[in-house]
A protein has these predicted regions:
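Loop/turn elements at helix/coil->beta-strand transitions in domains of secreted/extracellular proteins
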Residues: 270-275, 281, 311-317, 358-363, ...
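C-terminal catalytic-base region of ester-bond hydrolases, centering on the histidine
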Residues: 28-124, 480-669
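C-terminal outer-membrane/trafficking sorting elements
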Residues: 674-754
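Short, surface-exposed "cap/lid" segments of acyl-processing enzymes
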Residues: 250-321, 325
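Serine-dependent carboxylesterase/thioesterase catalytic core
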Residues: 343-467, 478, 500-544
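Bacterial Sec-dependent N-terminal signal peptides
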Residues: 1-21, 671, 735-737, 748
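Catalytic nucleophile-loop/oxyanion-hole region of alpha/beta-hydrolase
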Residues: 326-345
Length: 754
């Protein structure tokens, strides 16, 4: 009976994990003075021993310990974040150490009534039994998770060594290869290390103490890549726009900056046939020029569209939008900045390349993803302002001309976990640098900022359930883009990664997570629900719910948040619409190392969502996002490539590469129709016969085969192709192009003989 009364008292009196007054009377019983139960343990530091300590994991643990410490011995997390942010200006990566002992309440302490609550809703100890488990924590890591350089300068400052224990450090050592000798770290003195590889690279730390004990800690850093020996660029330059742009919320206009590299052709090594390739949405500048160039990879054989056109005499100019500082303490993240400012950078690059190039060949522009919007805006801006872009072809590659989509359920969930009571610092970075970036607010059709209650940073207004863009960003940008239209002096073509036949990604309203439980500790857990936006005409459907619960004999929900959504009568929700797909895990990559986030990402019912709707990538206006795309669809593009199945965003395939090559290498006919993937097919590889299929009549066709050196090795004239067609050839093994020129249409495709 006593237990039941105590339990009822607990249920009535329990408010939230964050109410530290509840734990105030336990302070005198705590030896470490850090009681972890005061915070929600997202890091699971007291449950699991991580073998690799990433920068974001270190920062999350620091944030939890800082808040759980009765004595408040550690600076606020914001101070640690400021040190990390200053690394951009200091050009060196700070290291940090965290040594601590923390306590958690034993589960049985509640069950045997060793701990209960008094009349003031405060926990009290009722016995002399041990009620706490003690956990030792020793972490060391860089405060920055990635670097674009292989030669990195590090520094460990004295004020970045956080130690709440009585242990005294005698020596600190580092190495990046287990076979190397240890290198002593001198406090407050910078030192450099060279990493031989790219990707995730190990860093090994050794902490020696005066008592003779030693701690070995493994950490990591991501090296974002460098130029390969086989693909060196001729130029690597910084470029600054000459036209400034002032975005909403900015106190002044800034000149945008970019980085460009020129990959000269493999024929004459002369800059005379430029193809511009622009980077897309890239918060944090995770791609350098070589990684952007690698976006042109396709298939399983290592083929690259850029390599193919360079063999044909074209030069590739890659434009990256890096992080930069236009003035003191201001950092602009170019990969997620205002589209207009990046467009002004591209305008300047076009002007400079036009002045440099030899001959009269006009430019080609390839704009993947957001790069398609940047290039569209820039080309049209130049036309409207009497600036000669000297461009003949604009190729949009799965670009969101009518907006992009990230499920509003995930937006709500991530924002609540980041900026609500949990204080998840790993997701804070995802929300601030990705979802809340200027570019995302311009592009996302449905944005969490459009749903928030007045004065709240996390809670949704249930009266706003239909898709709503970010205030002052989304509608303003789309209206400007619509009023400008498309470039008028170029041939405009588009590749979509979304299906043409209405194929869905999952189903509207489906559960992505259904009452999924994430166990943070023996006494703490989270219950998570996420759903895709609902079918047409359905309202008040739950799309996200987070419940934090504490175990006091039974599980009690102590704080929660929920978002509901509706779909218009004309179309089901965007999350499952046909379109270029994105992986939820990749979207939340900035939160990597967060065990709670990793848990539920590993248990999703579906791990992809519609990112760029098919209609958006083709600029087709229709109130139903699920409508089929065919020859009757009205699009501003002269030609389009649309697959029959949804593909990952900015995926190159044999089909769309053939489409791109046909557009780049051939002069267009006077009248073009949108080209779907089934229009013309060739079976690869071949032996002594070429098997081809055309769904439409190709009359008076001339078929030519060109080898890798550009030599024409086969020609046949006056051929009609309608349906299946076979052609006997005698070719040596190798790589070729086959060119079909007919009265109706022309193609150029890759051919492999083996």
């Amino acid at each position: 009976m006593k237990t039941k009364i105590t339990l009822l008292f607990l249920i009535i009196g329990l408010y939230a994990f964050s109410q530290k007054d509840n734990y105030a009377l336990l302070k005198e019983h705590s030896k470490t003075k850090i009681l972890y139960d005061q915070v929600f343990e997202l890091s699971k530091i007291t449950k699991e021993k991580k073998t690799e300590i990433s920068a974001m994991y270190f920062r999350q643990v620091y944030h939890e310990i800082q808040r759980a410490d009765y004595l408040q011995r550690l600076p606020k997390y914001e101070e640690l974040k400021k040190v990390a942010d200053n690394a951009f200006f200091e050009k060196q990566i700070p290291l940090s150490i965290l040594l601590s002992e923390v306590e958690t309440i034993k589960t049985e302490a509640f069950e045997n009534n060793s701990i209960s609550k008094n009349s003031n809703n405060q926990y009290v100890i009722n016995s002399n039994e041990l009620v706490f488990d003690v956990h030792e924590i020793a972490l060391m890591a860089p405060l920055i998770s990635k670097s674009k350089k292989q030669d990195i300068k590090f520094i460990l400052r004295e004020n970045q060594i956080f130690n709440t224990t009585n242990r005294v450090i005698s020596e600190l050592s580092i190495r990046i290869n287990e076979n190397e000798m240890w290198q002593t770290i001198q406090i407050n003195q910078s030192f450099s290390l060279h990493f031989n590889g790219n990707g995730k690279q190990p860093i090994y730390f050794k902490i020696s103490f005066t008592d003779g004990s030693t701690k070995y800690i493994n950490s990591t850093i991501d090296i974002l890549g460098n130029a390969s020996e086989n693909n060196q660029s001729a130029l690597a330059q910084t470029i600054t726009a000459t036209i400034p742009f002032q975005g909403f919320g900015e106190s002044q206009a800034y000149f945008g900056q970019g980085e460009y590299e020129i990959y000269l052709d493999n024929v004459n090594q002369v800059l005379d046939k430029p193809i511009f390739l622009l980077d897309g949405f890239d918060p944090g500048d995770t791609r350098n020029a070589d990684l952007i160039y690698s976006l042109l990879n396709y298939g399983n054989s290592g083929d690259n569209l850029g390599d193919i056109v360079r063999d044909e005499g074209f030069d590739i100019i890659v434009l990256n939008f890096p992080q930069y500082s236009p003035e003191e303490v201001i950092i602009i993240d170019g990969g997620a900045d205002f589209i207009q400012r990046n467009a002004m950078v591209f305008v300047e690059l076009i002007n400079q390349i036009n002045a440099l190039k030899v001959g009269t060949e006009k430019n080609v522009v390839i704009g993947p993803s957001m790069g398609g919007l940047i290039s569209r805006y820039a080309l049209r801006y130049m036309e409207m302002n009497n600036l000669n872009h000297d461009t003949r072809l604009y190729l949009s590659f799965d670009s969101p001309h009518l907006g992009a989509n990230v499920p509003i359920g995930f937006q709500h969930l991530f924002n609540y976990m980041a900026n609500g009571p949990l204080g998840d610092v790993t997701l804070q970075d995802v929300v601030s640098s990705v979802i809340s970036s200027s570019a995302a607010k311009q592009m996302l059709i449905d944005h969490y900022l459009g749903h928030l209650q007045a004065g709240s940073q996390t809670e949704f207004n249930n009266a706003i359930q239909l898709p709503t863009g970010a205030p002052n960003f989304r509608n303003a940008f789309q209206n400007e883009l619509n009023s400008m239209g498309f470039p008028q002096d170029t041939r405009n073509v588009a590749i979509s990664n979304g299906s043409s036949n209405g194929m869905m990604i999952g189903t509207p309203g489906m559960f992505v997570l259904n009452d999924y439980t994430v166990n943070a500790s023996a006494t703490q857990r989270a219950k998570i629900d996420v759903r895709f936006t609902p079918p047409a005409g359905v309202s008040n459907q739950l799309v996200s719910r987070f419940r934090a619960q504490q175990n006091i004999i039974i599980w009690i929900t102590v704080f929660s948040s929920q978002a509901n959504a509706a779909s218009p009568s004309t179309s089901s929700g965007l999350d499952s619409a046909p379109g270029g797909m994105f992986n939820v895990g990749d979207f939340a990559a900035g939160g990597s190392g967060n065990p709670t986030l990793d848990d539920f990402l590993a248990n999703l019912e579906i791990d992809r969502f519609c990112f760029i709707p098919t209609l958006s990538s083709l600029a087709i206006t229709n109130s139903n996002w699920y409508v089929n795309v065919d020859d009757t669809s009205i699009t501003p593009f002269a030609a389009t490539y649309v697959p029959t199945a949804n593909e990952d965003h900015v995926t190159l395939s044999d089909g769309n590469v053939e489409f791109a090559l046909n557009e780049i290498l051939n002069e267009p006919l006077s009248v073009e129709q949108p080209i779907l993937s089934e229009t013309f097919l060739i079976k690869n590889p071949i032996k002594n016969m070429i098997e081809m299929y055309s769904s439409n009549l190709l009359s008076n066709a001339t078929i030519s085969i060109i080898d890798a050196s550009g030599k024409k090795v086969f020609t046949q004239n006056n051929i009609s192709i309608n349906g299946n067609h076979q052609l006997n050839v005698n070719l040596s093994n190798g790589f070729y192009f086959i060119k079909i020129e007919s009265t109706e249409r022309s193609f150029i495709m890759k051919l492999i003989k083996n």
